[in-house]
């Protein structure tokens, strides 16, 4: 009997179009001999089609497992994961805690710092911060200004001076009340995919070669000019270090299922820094998460099979857990 897989995509987020593209790739990649797919589309106003998944156990007997493909807020941040927990439905990817912590760049950095993982020096501000320049005095230029809870480089700017810092702050606070300002790292941009629950494994890393000053939304999805190298041209020891740190970061934030961990390798110092972790990475034709696994020996269809099995396995583990006396 075929497994019935519900794919949720779209959403109220600046990454709506990326979600749609990722979902199309996943729907095309799921083996029709193994799976029957059900599409749940969420428009940019939050309306579900054909209708919302309701938070009542047993209300969705036609669904065996859910594959959320919602990038960014209202989907990658624990909100949909909480809904699926209430509905007692197995789902692909991190749980509520791992999703929420990973989505919030400040919380992710706090957890990594507690685990003594290498992170870039940063300052946290809010929309109400009276002077962004004063708040960031201890950081040298250039700086990166980022909404704390968005992905796909939406709302991110690189500031080289105080005037650009003010403009970057004005842009970022349109997307989030909390903003992260980081010391700019001049170096290589590297990524590593992680897969698994209790015993996660890391792929071979890749390198992003932006066509612009940094790998922003336009470079990722619109210009189609950025180049990638899979696997990255790195010494074996550095590759091993990236894979180890990717798994350590994954475990630190209590991730499950899948994630992509992004790194900077700084010129001059040759130091490696964890940039961020993405719990629902892109699955578009240009997305690096599946590409890294393909180069590590796991083809796209097999990757989807494994993600679904991890989701079902986690749900089976919960069925033997007592939640009441």
From Swiss-Prot:
Its EC number is 6.3.2.4. Its cofactor is Mg(2+); Mn(2+). ATP binds at residues 136-191. Mg(2+) 2 binds at residues 276, 278. One of its GO terms (biological process) is cell wall organization. GO terms for cellular component: cytosol. Pfam families: Dala_Dala_lig_C, Dala_Dala_lig_N. The keyword Cell wall biogenesis/degradation applies. Binds 2 magnesium or manganese ions per subunit. It is found in: Cytoplasm. Keywords: ATP-binding, Cell shape, Cell wall biogenesis/degradation, Cytoplasm, Ligase, Magnesium, Manganese, Metal-binding, Nucleotide-binding, Peptidoglycan synthesis. Pathway: Cell wall biogenesis; peptidoglycan biosynthesis. Residues 109-309 form the ATP-grasp domain. It comes from the Bacteria. Mg(2+) 1 binds at residues 262, 276. GO terms for molecular function: ATP binding; D-alanine-D-alanine ligase activity; metal ion binding. InterPro entries: ATP-grasp, ATP_grasp_subdomain_1, D-Ala_lig_Van_CS, D_ala_D_ala, Dala_Dala_lig_C, Dala_Dala_lig_N, PreATP-grasp_dom_sf. It catalyses: 2 D-alanine + ATP = D-alanyl-D-alanine + ADP + phosphate + H(+). It is an enzyme of class 6 (ligase). Cell wall formation. PANTHER family: D-ALANINE--D-ALANINE LIGASE, D-ALANINE--D-ALANINE LIGASE A. Belongs to the D-alanine--D-alanine ligase family. This is D-alanine--D-alanine ligase. It comes from Solibacter usitatus (strain Ellin6076).
